[in-house]
C-alpha cells in the first residue's frame, strides 16, 4: 500500500485532500482513493504507474472514455478519480469532481479543434491553390481560370460608388492579384462610364509600352525552337498577345510577370486619374474653427492619398502640414506635445476641442489669467506707490507729528505764528487773486453781490433818425467790461475798488 500511496506527495497531496467528491458535499478525496484507483487499473490490465504523471493520466482517460456509455459504475468512478488526479498534476484549481470533469471536457474540445485545423491545413497544402487565375490541373499543367462574375461585379460597384477616389487603387490591386493582361483588360472594359478617364488611362499605358520597347530592344535573329519570344509593350498590354503566350511568359523559367508589369502601368494611370478627380490640394486642407480634429485628420489623409509624391515627402507633409493647418486651439495643443508625438496622442489631446465644454474651459482660463493679472498689478501698484508721510512738527518725511521726537513746535504749523492753530490759519485760504476767502463781510461768494443791470441797449439806440456811432469812432482807450463784477464770485473785486 505504501507504493500505491506514494503517487502524490507534498503540496499536490494537500490539494488532493481539499477536493470534494460531490458539489456541496462534505466528503473529500483521501489516499485510500488513490489506492483503490491503482487496484482497479490492475484489474483492467492497465499500468498503475501511469497515475504518477499528468501524461499517464491523460492516456488512461483516453482508454476509459469509450467505455463510459456502456461501462459499470466502477469504470465511471475510476474515470472521475483519474480526471481529478490529472487536474492536480496540472495545478488546475478545482473544488469538486464535477469541475474536474468540466476542465477535462474543455481541454479535449480544444485539442480536437487544433487537430481538425491541422488536418485542414495539411489538406489545403496538399492541393493546388485555386485563388489565382492561373492554376495547375491534375497533370500539373498551368491552366487559366477566368475571373468570376462576383469579382467583376465588386469592381464595377466600387467604380459606381467611389468614382475614382483614392481608395479605388488598393481595391483594384486586391481584385487583380495574379491576373493576366487579358483579365486586367476585362476589368477595364467593364467600366461603362468615365470614358474621359479611360482615355487618359490608355494614353498612360501607351507611354509605358513605348518606354518598355525602348529599354528592352528585340534581339536580332530567329527564336530558338522550344523558346518563347520576348514580350513587347503591346504584348504586355494584351493587344498583340494571346492567353497562351501570356501564361507561358508568367510560368516560364525564368518567368516574365507580364501581368504584374501591366498592372503597374494601370495603377500609374489610375493615380493620374485620381489626381484629376481630387482637385483639392493637400495645402488647401485646413481645419475649420468648429471642426472636430478627427474630421480634419480624415480629410487630410484622404487628400494625402491622392498626392503624387514619394513616401518621404508624404511623411514630411504629415509631420508639418497636419499641425500647421490646424485651427488655433488645436495648434496650441499640438505644439505643446512636441514634434515626436504620434497621431494617436494628437487625436487624444485634441479630442473635444471646439465643443461647448472646451469653450467654457478656455473662457474660464482666460478670465482666471485676467483676474490674476489685475491682482498682481494692484499689489504691484500698492508696493511701488507707497504713501509718503511728512511730519508737521519737524518737516521731515517718514513719520508723523504724533511720533516725532523733536521738540514740540509752538504756534501754527502752517505759518509758524503763535496765537492760532493750523485749522484756523488764513494762509491756506487765499484765492488765486491773493485775497482771503471767505470774506468777513458781504454775502457768500456763490451769490450775486449786486443786482444785475440789463445788458440790452436802450430804446433810443434802435433808431428813430438817430445815428448809431460806428466802432471806429469810439475811443480806443474805452474797453467793454461785463456788468457783473468779480465781486459776485470771489467776494471783493480789486478793479471796482
Curated annotation (Swiss-Prot):
Name used for this protein in its record: Gag polyprotein
UniProt xrefs under SUPFAM superfamilies: Retroviral matrix proteins, Retrovirus capsid dimerization domain-like, Retrovirus capsid protein, N-terminal core domain, Retrovirus zinc finger-like domains
Segments for region (Interaction with host PPIA/CYPA and NUP153): 189-227
GO molecular function terms noted in the UniProt entry: RNA binding; structural molecule activity; zinc ion binding
Protein keywords: AIDS, Capsid protein, Host cell membrane, Host cytoplasm, Host endosome, Host membrane, Host nucleus, Host-virus interaction, Lipoprotein, Membrane, Metal-binding, Methylation, Myristate, Phosphoprotein, Repeat, RNA-binding, Viral budding, Viral budding via the host ESCRT complexes, Viral nucleoprotein, Viral release from host cell, Virion, Zinc, Zinc-finger
Gene: gag
Ranges spanned by the short sequence motif Nuclear export signal, renumbered to the chain: 16-22
Region (Interaction with host CALM1): 8-43
Region (Interaction with membrane phosphatidylinositol 4,5-bisphosphate and RNA): 14-33
Motif LYPX(n)L motif, residue range(s) on this chain: 480-489
UniProt-annotated stretches for the region Interaction with host AP3D1: 12-19
Stretches of the chain forming a coiled coil according to its record: none
Phosphoserine modified-residue sites: 148
Source organism of the structure: Human immunodeficiency virus type 1 group M subtype J (isolate SE9173)
Residue numbers spanned by region Dimerization/Multimerization of capsid protein p24: 277-363
Modified-residue entries (Asymmetric dimethylarginine), positions: 408
Amino acid at each position: 500500500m505504501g507504493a500505491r500511496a506514494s503517487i502524490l506527495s507534498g503540496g499536490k497531496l494537500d490539494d488532493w485532500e481539499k477536493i470534494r467528491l460531490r458539489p456541496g458535499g462534505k466528503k473529500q478525496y483521501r489516499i485510500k482513493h488513490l489506492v483503490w484507483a491503482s487496484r482497479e487499473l490492475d484489474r483492467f490490465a492497465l499500468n498503475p504507474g501511469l497515475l504518477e504523471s499528468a501524461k499517464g493520466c491523460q492516456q488512461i482517460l483516453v482508454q476509459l472514455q469509450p467505455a463510459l456509455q456502456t461501462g459499470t459504475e466502477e469504470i465511471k468512478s475510476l474515470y472521475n478519480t483519474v480526471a481529478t488526479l490529472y487536474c492536480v498534476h496540472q495545478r488546475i484549481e478545482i473544488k469538486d469532481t464535477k469541475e474536474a470533469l468540466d476542465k477535462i471536457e474543455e481541454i479535449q474540445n480544444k485539442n480536437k479543434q487544433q487537430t481538425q485545423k491541422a488536418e485542414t491545413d495539411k489538406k489545403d497544402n496538399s492541393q493546388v491553390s485555386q485563388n489565382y487565375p492561373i492554376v495547375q490541373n491534375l497533370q500539373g499543367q498551368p491552366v487559366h481560370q477566368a475571373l468570376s462574375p462576383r469579382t467583376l461585379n465588386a469592381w464595377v460597384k466600387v467604380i459606381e460608388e467611389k468614382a475614382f477616389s483614392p481608395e479605388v487603387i488598393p481595391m483594384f490591386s486586391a481584385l487583380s492579384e495574379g491576373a493576366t493582361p487579358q483579365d486586367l483588360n476585362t476589368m477595364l472594359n467593364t467600366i461603362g462610364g468615365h470614358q474621359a478617364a479611360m482615355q487618359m488611362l490608355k494614353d498612360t499605358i501607351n507611354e509605358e509600352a513605348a518606354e518598355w520597347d525602348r529599354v528592352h530592344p528585340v534581339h536580332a535573329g530567329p527564336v530558338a525552337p522550344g523558346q518563347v519570344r520576348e514580350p513587347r509593350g503591346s504584348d504586355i498590354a494584351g493587344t498583340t498577345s494571346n492567353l497562351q503566350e501570356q501564361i507561358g511568359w508568367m510560368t516560364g523559367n525564368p518567368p516574365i510577370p507580364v501581368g504584374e508589369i501591366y498592372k503597374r502601368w494601370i495603377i500609374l494611370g489610375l493615380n493620374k486619374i485620381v489626381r484629376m478627380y481630387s482637385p483639392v490640394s493637400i495645402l488647401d486642407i485646413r481645419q475649420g474653427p468648429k471642426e472636430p480634429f478627427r474630421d480634419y485628420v480624415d480629410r487630410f489623409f484622404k487628400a494625402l492619398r491622392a498626392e503624387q509624391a514619394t513616401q518621404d515627402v508624404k511623411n514630411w507633409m504629415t509631420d508639418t502640414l497636419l499641425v500647421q493647418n490646424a485651427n488655433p486651439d488645436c495648434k496650441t495643443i499640438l505644439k505643446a506635445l512636441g514634434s515626436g508625438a504620434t497621431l494617436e496622442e494628437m487625436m487624444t489631446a485634441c479630442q473635444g476641442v471646439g465643443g461647448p465644454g472646451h469653450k467654457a474651459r478656455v473662457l474660464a482660463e482666460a478670465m482666471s489669467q485676467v483676474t490674476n493679472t489685475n491682482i498682481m498689478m494692484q499689489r504691484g501698484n500698492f508696493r511701488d506707490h507707497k504713501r509718503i508721510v511728512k511730519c508737521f512738527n519737524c518737516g521731515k518725511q517718514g513719520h508723523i507729528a504724533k511720533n516725532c521726537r523733536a521738540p514740540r513746535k509752538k504756534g501754527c504749523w502752517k505759518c509758524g505764528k503763535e496765537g492760532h492753530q493750523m485749522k484756523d490759519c488764513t494762509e491756506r485760504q487765499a484765492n488765486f487773486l491773493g485775497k482771503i476767502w471767505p470774506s468777513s463781510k458781504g454775502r457768500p461768494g456763490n451769490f450775486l453781490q449786486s443786482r444785475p443791470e440789463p445788458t440790452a441797449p436802450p430804446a433810443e439806440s434802435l433808431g428813430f433818425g438817430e445815428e448809431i456811432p460806428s466802432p471806429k469812432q469810439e475811443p480806443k482807450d474805452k474797453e467793454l467790461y461785463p456788468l457783473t463784477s468779480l465781486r459776485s464770485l470771489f467776494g471783493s473785486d480789486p478793479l471796482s475798488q
